[in-house]
From Swiss-Prot:
L-glutamate binds at residue 41. This is Phosphoserine aminotransferase. GO terms for molecular function: O-phospho-L-serine:2-oxoglutarate aminotransferase activity; pyridoxal phosphate binding. Pathway: Amino-acid biosynthesis; L-serine biosynthesis; L-serine from 3-phospho-D-glycerate: step 2/3; Cofactor biosynthesis; pyridoxine 5'-phosphate biosynthesis; pyridoxine 5'-phosphate from D-erythrose 4-phosphate: step 3/5. Its EC number is 2.6.1.52. Homodimer. Pyridoxal 5'-phosphate binds at residues 75-76, 99, 147, 166, 189, 231-232.
Length: 355
């Protein structure tokens, strides 16, 4: 039976990427060695790193003066590194969910944190629109897609101060005006690679301006100067990231990923809105295309476990919603084929007919 992987992350990767990575695990570049055991200082892996960085910049149209880094520690490490490197006195944060809240918590150890707006009182079911960003803030931080609650910023916001963004779950799903940001970061295990590598886009001239001492491993300049090789990088995930970037480029780049994301999300949301058994949880204007969250309608609430089993038996994997929201979550990242979304829709319609 075909499996349809709707997991929120680690998540689905393109089949071609998995196959190429599997080949490299057995024999990397005809070397007779596995990519798991080659030196990160060798010319073969340096070529992988160089290509991954070049493709990253090309696909996102990153301007001159920015570096792309592949680091460890996940987005959670970036919650600390961002204020360590950029927060001198005050930073502004938009609180749209658990991950934004965690980022704010870390930043409070480095200076004043202004929460410009929050949707916590509504369990983060919408993204606040009416707020003022302090003109004297060192930066304004946003989380562009909220995996738990199924909300997404529709494009780049305007800000009177430099912006920082956690794009863990929607990177490469749409065009981005990188020039608006001094830093964009994210865990790669949604739209880019297996878990274990973190991507960071950082504006070179924004680094080195805070007065505090920054430990070497937490200093962006260290990793810019070292080409992401100050310490041993996560070799295998970077290799897979390079293969994913090749795939994105071959498929038509972020414009095509954007088109596909909208098409897949529109299909599933249309069924959620049509089907009497299901209800979407996020405000319609803020609905995420990456993480589609829904619950059983109140009169069918007692059938939630039944639908989960029914869907699982039909090959749907990873659709159980986060514990803070409940219900279901279908994550439709770039590698998710339209056919899998249709399979979930068929499953929902079949369940409806049975009840």
């Amino acid at each position: 039976m075909k499996k349809h992987n709707f997991s929120a992350g680690p998540s689905i990767l393109p089949r071609e990427v998995i196959e190429e990575t599997a080949k490299a695990i057995l024999d990397f570049n005809g070397s007779g060695l596995s990519v798991l055991e080659v030196s990160h200082r060798g010319k073969d892996f340096q070529a992988v790193m160089d290509e991954a960085v070049a493709l990253f910049k090309e696909i996102l149209n990153i301007p001159e003066g920015y570096s792309v880094l592949f680091l460890g520690g996940g987005a959670s490490m970036q919650f600390c590194m961002v204020p360590y490197n950029f927060l001198e006195k005050k930073a502004a944060y938009l609180n749209t969910g658990v991950w934004a809240k965690k980022a704010m918590k870390e930043a409070k150890g480095f200076g004043e944190v202004v929460e410009v707006a929050s949707s916590a009182d509504a369990n983060y079911t919408f993204i606040p629109k009416d707020f003022t960003i302090p003109a004297d803030a060192d930066y304004f931080h946003v989380t562009t897609n909220n995996t738990i609650y199924g909300t997404e910023l529709k494009g780049d916001l305007d800000s009177p101060v430099p912006m920082v963004a956690d794009m863990s779950s929607d990177i490469f799903s749409r065009p981005v005006d990188v020039s608006k940001y001094i830093c964009i970061y994210g865990g790669a295990q949604k739209n880019l690679a297996p878990s274990g590598v973190t991507f960071v886009i950082v504006k070179d001239d924004a680094v080195g301006k805070v007065s505090r001492y920054i430990p070497s491993m937490l200093n962006y300049k260290t990793h810019i100067d070292g080409g992401s090789m100050f310490n041993t990088p996560p070799v295998l995930p970077i290799y897979s990231a390079m293969q994913t970037l090749r795939w994105i480029k071959a498929q038509g780049g972020v414009k095509e990923m954007d088109r596909r994301a909208t098409e897949k999300a529109d299909m599933l949301y249309a069924e959620i809105d049509r089907n009497k058994m299901f209800v979407g949880t996020a405000a319609k204007e803020d609905r995420s295309r990456m993480n589609i969250c829904f619950v059983m309608a109140p009169e069918y609430k007692d059938l939630e476990a039944d639908f989960l089993k029914f869907a699982t038996d039909k090959g749907m994997s990873g659709i159980k919603g986060h514990r803070s929201v409940g219900g279901f979550r279908a994550s439709c990242y770039n590698a998710m084929p339209k056919e899998s979304v249709q399979a979930l829709i068929d499953c929902m319609q079949e369940f409806e007919k049975l009840h």
